[in-house]
């Protein structure tokens, strides 16, 4: 819990919420919360939107989750729904319920969901625990001499926890309103055999741009997805931007040890 509180600085959990208060305000503006029947009736449930004392729930063998009744919990659901509406509704005015908002404003809306993911899945001790099954599977697959291609399907929470467990440096994706794990994004690890006989690895996050998503564009060689290189803390890339495979394997092994250390 202390690692999560540290994300908000001296104010801890409250500090996390205060940092995204403008993003909360954007969501409530788009939803016309102040004009809603609940607001007119002074429904006490709306007090949750001003509650910055986010509470986390922990259960053995379960992923962490947030207790209902806080701004982050309730407005994350709204953020998620609005993001999908923005992707699916061609008319941006209609997507925002008649509000003329900018791409930057949509980034604010999506930032609430990004923060929610960070709180739940990117504290180092949480990531090491939650990501462990995937880290083990990926490690085994990457070391399999006969494996040519492996495709794993998961959730944005899986991407967040795996990236943290592997020590990926902070990043913000271009041409995306979701800056870390856009819908449909994938972490792609490629292996190469160098002319020197050594194995190398490239690690990127691959995703569709906002326009590709909103316009439902087919992806091909003439219209490829976005590819953003991920950087692993403490590891050096060569001139081609690749890591030594033995260094990447060592990073996976460290992530596996991190899990063992918290058992």
What is each of the regions a protein language model found here?
Residues 1-150, 154-263:
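Signature for phosphate-centric chemistry
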């Amino acid at each position: 819990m202390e690692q999560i509180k540290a994300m908000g600085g001296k104010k801890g959990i409250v500090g996390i919420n205060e940092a995204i208060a403008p993003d909360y305000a954007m969501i409530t503006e788009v939803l016309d919360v102040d004009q809603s029947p609940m607001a007119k009736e002074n429904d006490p449930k709306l007090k949750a939107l001003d509650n910055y004392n986010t509470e986390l729930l922990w259960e053995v063998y379960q992923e962490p989750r947030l207790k209902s009744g806080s701004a982050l919990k309730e407005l994350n659901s709204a953020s998620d729904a609005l993001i999908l509406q923005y992707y699916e509704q061609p008319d941006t005015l209609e997507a925002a319920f008649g509000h003329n908002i900018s791409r930057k404003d949509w980034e604010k809306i999506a930032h609430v969901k990004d923060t929610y993911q960070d709180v739940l899945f990117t504290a180092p001790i949480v990531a090491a625990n939650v990501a462990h099954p995937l880290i083990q599977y990926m490690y085994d697959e990457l070391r399999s001499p006969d494996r040519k291609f492996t495709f794993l399907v998961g959730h944005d929470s899986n991407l967040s926890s795996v990236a943290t467990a592997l020590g990926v440096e902070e990043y913000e994706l271009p041409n995306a309103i979701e800056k870390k794990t856009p819908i449909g994004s994938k972490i792609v690890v490629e292996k190469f055999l160098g002319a020197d006989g050594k194995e190398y690895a490239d690690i990127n996050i691959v995703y569709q741009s906002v326009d590709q998503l909103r316009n439902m564009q087919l992806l091909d060689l003439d219209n490829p997805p976005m590819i953003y290189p991920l950087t692993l803390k403490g590891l050096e890339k060569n001139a081609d931007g690749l890591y030594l495979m033995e260094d990447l394997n060592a990073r996976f092994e460290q992530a596996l040890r991190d899990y063992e250390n918290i058992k």
